[in-house]
Amino acid sequence: MENYINLFIRAVFIENLALSFFLGMCTFLAVSKKVKTAFGLGVAVIVVLGISVPVNNLIYHNILAPGALEWAGFPDADLSFLKFLTFIGVIAAIVQILEMALDKYVPALYNALGIFLPLITVNCAIFGGVAFMVERDYNFGESVVFGIGSGVGWALAIVALAAVREKLKYADVPDGLRGLGITFISVGLIGLGFMSFSGVSL
């Protein structure tokens, strides 16, 4: 249990996908103008990462990994060259299901997210989470915790940035820094804040 708690804390704070690895910056910067919209996208990312990482873990370890098809009578089979294609397909399917669910049950959030909801499919934060799971050889339980933790970390980062950007509307920002300029500085400062967790050993 302690291992899972440590993994979750590490995924949220120490190895934050947005602020440590700078993954998913396109949607991170574009949808962080309002806290409500940022929170909605953050929840969507948590759901997609929380499902896609463990599902891809099962597919990789039971079908794609070298020797994984021993149960089917093919002990020498190695389908790992298909992993990227498979991972993207699974992520796309999950995002499509989420998109249909939001359109039906939360149309206001669906309309607010607009084009950025289907863009979660190609959001490198989602693919990065899945790739890290394979690289670090997580088991199924660890992949569930890592997927949810990575999603929570990304959501926390985008909501924090959205809160700062909402306050910046009332700030006297120099003309040359308005828009993305002050946003990049804000992201850097939030990232520096999260760097303080890098000294934590778990």
From Swiss-Prot:
GO CC terms, sorted: Gram-negative-bacterium-type cell wall; plasma membrane
Subcellular location: Cell inner membrane
Alphabetic keyword roster: Cell inner membrane, Cell membrane, Ion transport, Membrane, NAD, Sodium, Sodium transport, Translocase, Transmembrane, Transmembrane helix, Transport, Ubiquinone
BP terms from Gene Ontology: respiratory electron transport chain; sodium ion transport
A Gene Ontology molecular function term of the record: oxidoreductase activity, acting on NAD(P)H, quinone or similar compound as acceptor
Catalytic reaction annotation: a ubiquinone + n Na(+)(in) + NADH + H(+) = a ubiquinol + n Na(+)(out) + NAD(+)
Chain segments annotated as transmembrane: 11-31, 39-59, 81-101, 114-134, 144-164, 180-200
Main location: membrane
EC number, as in UniProt: 7.2.1.1
Entry superkingdom: Bacteria
EC class name: translocase
InterPro entries, A to Z: NqrDE/RnfAE, NqrDE/RnfAE_oxidrdctase, NqrE
Job description of the protein: NQR complex catalyzes the reduction of ubiquinone-1 to ubiquinol by two successive reactions, coupled with the transport of Na(+) ions from the cytoplasm to the periplasm. NqrA to NqrE are probably involved in the second step, the conversion of ubisemiquinone to ubiquinol.
Family per similarity comment: Belongs to the NqrDE/RnfAE family.
Name of this protein: Na(+)-translocating NADH-quinone reductase subunit E
Species this chain originates from: Idiomarina loihiensis (strain ATCC BAA-735 / DSM 15497 / L2-TR)
Taxonomic lineage from the root: Bacteria, Pseudomonadati, Pseudomonadota, Gammaproteobacteria, Alteromonadales
Gene name in the database record: nqrE
